[in-house]
Each structure stands twice: as C-alpha cells, then as structure tokens.
C-alpha cells in the first residue's frame, strides 16, 4: 500500500463532504459509493453538528476508508484527526497554526491550508503545508465573503510559483472544469458537484475522466 502522502500527489480529485450541502445524502453512504474509484481525497466538513456527532461521523468514514486508496481528511479539528488517526487535517485561515498541527499530528500526516491569494499560498508552502486549496475560483454560496471568486488568472500565478500540490476550488463543475485545467490546475476540489449530484459515482467518474485525460 502506498503512503497517503504519495496518494495525495497522485490524486487529481478532492471531494469535500459538507453535511450542510449533502442534506439528502448521508456522508457514509456517499463515501461508500465513491471510495473505490481512482485515488482521491475525501474531506469531512461539518460545521453544524456537535463534536460528539462529528466524532461518530468521522469514525464511520475512517473505518470505511481504512486501507483504501482514498485519503481521508478532517476539516478544522486537529484533535479529532489525532484521536481517529485520520490521514490529515485541513485548516482554514482562522484555525490553529500549521506548526501546532504538525507538532500534534507528526510528519507522516497530511496538512492542507486554504488560500485565497498568491501570498497566502507562498506562506503556506514555506511553512510546510503538504498541499493548499486555492479559491474560490468561481462564485459559490459556500464562500459568500468572496462574492466574485478569485478568477482564473490567480490559478496561472499559483501554477508558476507553487511547487506543492494545489487544488483549485470553488464553484467548479463539469461545465467549467476545462477552463480551470487550461489555466494550469491539475487538481480540483469540489463539493456541490458531487454532494448534490443525483448519482454521485457517475458524477465523480465524469470529473475524474476529464482530469486524467489532461
């Protein structure tokens, strides 16, 4: 079995399972549908449940994905990532520092950082992030504080300056993913494109096929 950091580098598609967005699908059921596809990353993001509920959800997903090709990331909660031996944690701009997360989780775990401009991306890389997400590329209701999105030009700049894996994120779907790829992104992260799809697996396969042919 390859290390999860190796799988991170091979992954093209990053699925964010947000309980608020996936209102019609249980996270575990959704993960069980998609986990046997190409190497990918799944992040559990739940900002509405109490911590006990979140731990139960995360444990179920961790158990389902154990020994799979899927990298399992927990959003925000370093302590839950440590408790459940998740593959890593994703931190936003206001969360605990990357250095604290690294000290708690160790060098073998994956730490990702949300970035909205090139300076943030460079800082995250220099501080030892394993990957970054950069966005939102397009307008998305999930990021109302950046109503216009960051645009495709920033993807081009990140492509030229960032050496660690980066995932373009924000409003990306099958109708605009080729524009993102043409701007220099080899990897994308999506939420609504999978969580709100009528059938998650075909939707995932379609996006994955587009990414892997480029």
Regions found by a protein language model. Name each.
Residues 183:
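C-terminal binding/interaction regions
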Residues 81, 138-144:
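A short acidic, helix-capping loop that chelates divalent metal ions and anchors anionic groups
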Residues 135-138, 164:
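Hydrophobic alpha-helix-in-membranes signature
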Residues 1-98, 102-131, 147-150, 157, ...:
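Conserved N-terminal beta1-alpha1 strand-loop-helix module at the mouth
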